[in-house]
């Protein structure tokens, strides 16, 4: 299995605001076999910003995109996130098995 990661940088929202929504999104993603990780920058010019990494099987990329688009829990979480955070960047990377 080849794993793909989507790495996103977000700006906005406090820990108290972001955490409950992130927990909901993580649970919704897990139903689709997507791994979700949230981190907060603690140094540098992005202090206080968020780094989100989601990982999934590359072969399932298109299928997962369609499933997420139809998943009400995911769409609700995306709408909530948009109220307090702005996505600064998003990159898709292929994970290498070394």
Feature names for model-found ranges:
Residues 9-20:
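Short, surface-exposed ligand-recognition loops at beta-strand->loop->(often short) alpha-helix junctions
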Residues 20-37, 55-91:
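An amphipathic, aromatic/His-enriched active-site/gating alpha helix that lines ligand/cofactor pockets
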Residues 43-46, 91-98:
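Long, low-complexity, Ser/Thr/Gly/Pro-rich intrinsically disordered segments that act as flexible linkers
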